[in-house]
């Protein structure tokens, strides 16, 4: 796969739009040399000002750790986002912005399309990868900010009951650079000043990468 060529095509496509996202899908068949690349523009995602999450069990998730009798989708290998979307829609029907996925032990995993983080005291936490969560780019940036001593970061695990007691919760994705979560289930949160620091770290990182790319 010629990633440099894909990168050039992405930049060319992005130059036609003032805002939005450029998405890339690479599909491969049984042969390593046989693949297709799809590059497309997506309009900016509208994110509600007050962002709320409903906790939901996720037996289909790689980190769900549910038994076969718990749900018929356990053990199903799928590249479909249908199950993610279904949990988002359930949350929306119940008056929430999105879903917060839990495993069998009620440990917080991630969202259907985003990673999760939380703040307690002066420390920022993200779930560890052994839970089967996605090692997302934005999650990697949180760890990078920690290694650069911009913020204090730890990988950890937290139950849904424990996350009710933290100071601040936020979500991270391509469209959500540390978006404040105002409510999980019936628990409401206040925004820690550290969250603004995280958001500032993302803004500066993007500017650095833009400068490096277009030198």
Region locations from a protein language model:
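Helix-start/capping segments and mature chain N-termini
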Residues: 1-12, 32-215
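Short, acidic/charged, Gly/Pro-enriched secondary-structure junctions
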Residues: 4-28
